[in-house]
UniProtKB/Swiss-Prot annotation:
Lineage start: Eukaryota, Viridiplantae, Streptophyta, Embryophyta, Tracheophyta
Organism: Glycine max (Soybean)
Protein name: Inositol-tetrakisphosphate 1-kinase 1
Tissue: Expressed in seeds.
Catalytic activity: 1D-myo-inositol 1,3,4-trisphosphate + ATP = 1D-myo-inositol 1,3,4,5-tetrakisphosphate + ADP + H(+); 1D-myo-inositol 1,3,4-trisphosphate + ATP = 1D-myo-inositol 1,3,4,6-tetrakisphosphate + ADP + H(+); 1D-myo-inositol 3,4,5,6-tetrakisphosphate + ATP = 1D-myo-inositol 1,3,4,5,6-pentakisphosphate + ADP + H(+); 1D-myo-inositol 3,4,6-trisphosphate + ATP = 1D-myo-inositol 1,3,4,6-tetrakisphosphate + ADP + H(+)
Chain ranges of the ATP-grasp domain: 104-318
Residues that bind 1D-myo-inositol 6-phosphate: 16, 58, 148, 153, 185, 187, 271, 290, 294, 297
Cofactor binding remark: Binds 2 magnesium ions per subunit.
TM region positions: none
Compositional bias segments (type: Basic and acidic residues): 328-339
Chain segments carrying region Catalytic specificity elements (CSE): 208-243
Names of required cofactors: Mg(2+)
Length: 339
């Protein structure tokens, strides 16, 4: 008996992303639910391929945006995950976190926000003490652009004002907040939300702050998500997983934040990093938001993504049926009048 075909999803991903995300385990599980995952050939126009019920992508550039628009014109009912315009908001570390201020979560004891931060566009501003005098050191220096490139992941913990001249603008200076050396990574897949805890930068004591760091006034570090390669992803998870009794944020609180971000950003596939401010027991700070993160690092990602794909296909089918009914209604009325 032939397998029931629910939908075809074309995926357009960079080679590294494809290798880490499109695993045999995901392809097999999706196929068992009637979802076929098909690679988009980057050497051919998207509009000449398929047809696809959905395009799952993480490619950038004007040419790719044009291809998506042409595909949408040909197949207006096809689902694009996600809209390039919505994704681009996350490419700027200032605009990505501005959305947090738009959230309204009521009737909860927990509070949330973002660390104090400023953007420095040029060297002259960087060397002007008045530009950053409101910040308390240490600060984390991050490139303003967050486009997934290796350059965008180059960050540093800056302990002293004198170390600022080692940085290259445009950058964002974000106050470092002690958080117990634990970061909570919240994965969002449509309405599915999964929160895991990972090791983070250790707290900085008052003595270390006074001395300007342990041994250096500026300490470079790699973003945690870049530590793993495809081959050592499982080892990465074991390394970064915390077996201690660190308390997780309340599930309902995390789900509320995730839902608010999903609606405000108009995105389905992203994760956000949260820390618990060590100065307050129930104060949480969102420090980063990433589009289409490394879902393979999330335990059981295959089941979550497959269920999401099925939900996307079901919603698409329901919308098409509704459109068909609305399109037939005037015709049926006209025929009844003629009779």
């Amino acid at each position: 008996m032939a397998e029931k075909r629910f939908g075809v999803i074309g995926y357009a991903l960079a080679p590294k992303k494809q290798n880490s995300f499109i695993r045999d385990s995901l392809v097999s599980l999706a196929k068992s639910r009637g979802i076929e995952l098909v690679r988009v050939d980057s050497d051919k126009p998207l509009a000449d391929q398929g047809p696809f019920d959905c395009v799952l992508h993480k490619l950038y550039g004007d040419d790719w945006k044009r291809q998506l628009q042409e595909f949408h014109t040909l197949y207006p009912n096809a689902v694009i995950l996600d809209a390039p315009e919505a994704i681009e908001r996350l490419h700027n570390r200032i605009s990505m976190l501005q959305v947090v201020s738009e959230l309204r979560i009521e009737d909860r004891p927990e509070t949330f926000g973002i660390p104090k931060q400023i953007v420095i566009y040029d060297k002259a501003t960087l060397l002007d003490p008045q530009a950053w005098e409101s910040l308390k050191f240490p600060v984390i220096a991050k490139p303003l652009v967050a486009d997934g490139s290796a350059k965008s992941h180059k960050m540093a913990l800056v302990f002293t004002r004198d170390a600022l001249n080692k940085l290259k603008p445009p950058i964002v200076l974000q106050e470092f907040v002690n958080h117990g050396g634990v970061i909570f990574k919240v994965y969002v897949v449509g309405e599915h939300v999964r929160c895991v805890k990972r090791k983070s930068l250790p707290d900085v004591s008052d003595e270390e702050k006074a001395l300007g760091g342990v041994s250096e006034d500026l300490m470079s570090f790699s973003q945690v998500s870049n530590l793993a390669t495809v081959n050592d992803c499982d080892g990465y998870y074991r390394l970064m997983h915390l077996d201690d009794d660190t308390e997780m944020p309340p599930d309902a609180f995390v789900v509320d934040i995730a839902g608010g971000l999903r609606r405000a950003l108009k995105l389905n596939l992203f994760n956000f990093d949260v820390i618990r401010d060590a100065r307050y027991g129930n104060r949480y700070l969102i420090i980063d938001i990433n589009y289409f993160p490394g879902y393979a690092k999330m335990p059981g990602y295959e089941a979550v993504l497959t269920q999401f794909f099925c939900e996307v296909m079901l919603k698409k089918k329901q919308q098409e049926e509704q459109q068909q009914e609305e399109g037939n209604a005037p015709k049926e009325k006209e025929e009844s009048l003629q009779a």
